Amino acid sequence: MRQATVTRNTLETRITVSLNLDGSGQARFDTGVPFLEHMLDQIARHGLIDLDITAQGDLHIDAHHTVEDLGITLGQAFARAIGDKKGIRRYGHAYVPLDEALSRVVLDLSGRPGLEYHVDYTRATIGSFDVDLFSEFFHGFVNHAMVTLHIDNLRGINSHHQAETIFKAFGRALRMAVEPDPRMAGVTPSTKGTLTA
């Protein structure tokens, strides 16, 4: 099974992420950031990734450190679980609509971290959640999962819908990229022979 557990403790946050890339979308969260948990649930359910995440952070200041560090820890767990990447599809993409909103996510498990994030939210907050923190989450993830990730919200009026289409598409793109390719069994999907940058 491709699974991993990572604990990351700093003076600002204490976070544990357990994931199973070959799961069924089961999820349990205790982060103190409800809207983020709603988005993480989209990753689990649409990516068929089992996620168990606990986080304690300096939420008396704001959610910035918790959200960013959660992205970092999730990226570390993902990198550990995916291993040497032999026999996987490597690339993943998805378009996901929700009513008026439409987002596209494309990723490459390349070993080279990079984020292209093109989202213009129609509001600065969703409930009490600062939408700027989504970018921090994805930056943390790509820098520690060592993936290239392109996120484009193509249209949307409702900020909740914009965010939800992004996270659903991210989950589906991950599912595609990590899926074993029976024609590539035991083979690294790169002409370089490695996907470690």
UniProtKB/Swiss-Prot annotation:
- Top-level enzyme category: lyase
| Annotated keywords | Amino-acid biosynthesis, Cytoplasm, Histidine biosynthesis, Lyase
Which Gene3D superfamilies does the annotation name? Imidazole glycerol phosphate dehydratase, domain 1
Q: Which SUPFAM superfamilies match?
A: Ribosomal protein S5 domain 2-like (SSF54211)
Give EC number(s), comma-separated. 4.2.1.19
List cystine links.
none
Molecular function (GO) terms listed? imidazoleglycerol-phosphate dehydratase activity
Extract the NCBIfam families matched here. Answer: PRK00951.1-1, PRK00951.1-5, PRK00951.2-1, PRK00951.2-4
Provide an example Pfam family for this protein: IGPD
* GO cellular component terms, A-Z: cytoplasm
Q: Which residues form a coiled coil?
A: none
This chain belongs to the protein called Imidazoleglycerol-phosphate dehydratase
Pathway the protein acts in: Amino-acid biosynthesis; L-histidine biosynthesis; L-histidine from 5-phospho-alpha-D-ribose 1-diphosphate: step 6/9
Protein's GO biological process: L-histidine biosynthetic process
Q: What is the lineage of its organism?
A: Bacteria, Pseudomonadati, Pseudomonadota, Betaproteobacteria, Neisseriales
Encoded by which gene? hisB
Q: Which InterPro entries match?
A: IGPD_sf (IPR038494), ImidazoleglycerolP_deHydtase (IPR000807), ImidazoleglycerP_deHydtase_CS (IPR020565), Ribosomal_Su5_D2-typ_SF (IPR020568)
**Reaction catalysis annotation:** D-erythro-1-(imidazol-4-yl)glycerol 3-phosphate = 3-(imidazol-4-yl)-2-oxopropyl phosphate + H2O
Q: Which family does it belong to?
A: Belongs to the imidazoleglycerol-phosphate dehydratase family.
Q: Cross-referenced HAMAP family, in alphabetical order? A: HisB
Q: Where is the signal peptide?
A: none
Q: Which PANTHER family match?
A: IMIDAZOLEGLYCEROL-PHOSPHATE DEHYDRATASE, IMIDAZOLEGLYCEROL-PHOSPHATE DEHYDRATASE HIS7
**Location of this chain's protein in the cell:** Cytoplasm
List the PROSITE patterns hit by this protein, alphabetically.
IGP_DEHYDRATASE_1, IGP_DEHYDRATASE_2
